Amino acid sequence: MPPDFSPIRGAQGLQLSNPSVLGVASLLGSLQVFQEAGMVGPLRTRSIELTAYLGKLLAQSAYFVSAHEAAMRLPLCAVSSTDHDQHRRPAFTIITPSDANSRGSQLSLLFFSSDAELMHKVLEGLRSYGVIGDERHPNVIRLTPTALYNTVQDCENGAKYLEEVLKELDI
């Protein structure tokens, strides 16, 4: 090798002949956790069960609307003044496919309200209870029960806290 470094251009320049010891050590720990959990098969089964259970709990919410009712509400940004009172109450539906083979473990909740800030308020309310969700603007919150460490109780708490937050925001 010459004494001067001459990098290879492009993505090939990022190749390594030996991985970092720290990177491999953290990978080993992660693989050991997956091995203890039974690897991918049992984790996927548990993921399907947890996600289905969370979906069932969310569908029991007083603020949940069916796919049919959600379709009637969709042009929300064009709500007329006569429709305003009908859509004042916060509501949500699940837009993730119901078939477990057509989705991962995440459920996307689409929120309906005349309040443009509803999704942000709900997300902040959930965070105050320790429920971590992911936001997609303008009005979707994604909740994901993770098979490695979430429990049935976590799903029950998440659904309960969502109900409490929406109740607090209901005018």
Model-identified regions with their sequence ranges:
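A general structural signal marking secondary-structure boundaries and capping sites
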Residues: G38, A62, L166-L169
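Short amphipathic alpha-helical segments
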Residues: G10-Q12, R103-L107, N139-T144
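Non-transmembrane alpha-helical segments in soluble domains
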Residues: L28-L31, G55, A159, E163
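Conserved PLP-binding catalytic core of the aspartate aminotransferase-like
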Residues: I48-G55, A59-Y129
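Active-site C-terminal subdomain of aminotransferase-like
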Residues: M1-R46, A52
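PLP-dependent enzyme catalytic core of the Aspartate aminotransferase-like
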Residues: D115-K121, G125-I171
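Short alpha-helical functional segments enriched in proximate histidine and acidic residues
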Residues: V33, L57, S61, V165
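A generic fold-level signal
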Residues: P19, N101-S102, E135
